[in-house]
Design a protein with these regions (language model features):
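Bacterial N-terminal signal peptides
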Residues: 11-19
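Bacterial N-terminal signal peptides that target proteins for export
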Residues: 2-11
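Lipid interaction determinants
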Residues: 22-75, 81-127
């Protein structure tokens, strides 16, 4: 019985560590400067000449900044949990974005905006 209890505790701790290490890896991979390369709205690509002005930056202290079109800027704290990216701006407003894909070169985010699904594809420019 003692061996079974020890094994159960080990399995539980292993699962717990794997979840926390996944979040650590995602937080580590997202750190850097990301430039938008494509934007889709309801699966249709948007042709936008100002796409290169959209920049997302994440640092290893949990801070983010966003520069968009029309001189829109935002900054605050971020957190990655599972496949979600939580952004909390300086006014303490939180947004949740779905991470469709994240690796060392590409970030794909999904969000709902005015009842429309928006997909933003970013390419990493700096670590």
């Amino acid at each position: 019985m003692g061996m079974l209890r020890t094994t159960s505790k080990f399995i539980f701790l292993s699962i717990l560590l794997s979840f926390s290490s996944c979040n650590f890896i995602a937080n580590y991979q997202i750190v850097g400067v990301w430039k938008a390369t494509e934007i889709f709205e309801n699966d249709k690509i948007l042709k936008d000449k100002t796409l290169e002005n959209i920049i997302l930056q994440f640092n290893d202290e949990g801070n983010y900044s966003y520069e968009g079109t029309l001189n829109y800027k935002e900054a605050g704290k971020f957190k990655v949990s599972s496949n979600s990216l939580f952004l909390t701006n300086q006014l303490k407003e939180e947004k949740e974005l779905h991470i469709e894909s994240l690796n060392s070169k590409k970030l794909v985010l999904l969000m709902e905006d005015s009842g429309k699904t928006r997909k933003m594809v970013f390419s990493k420019t700096f670590n």
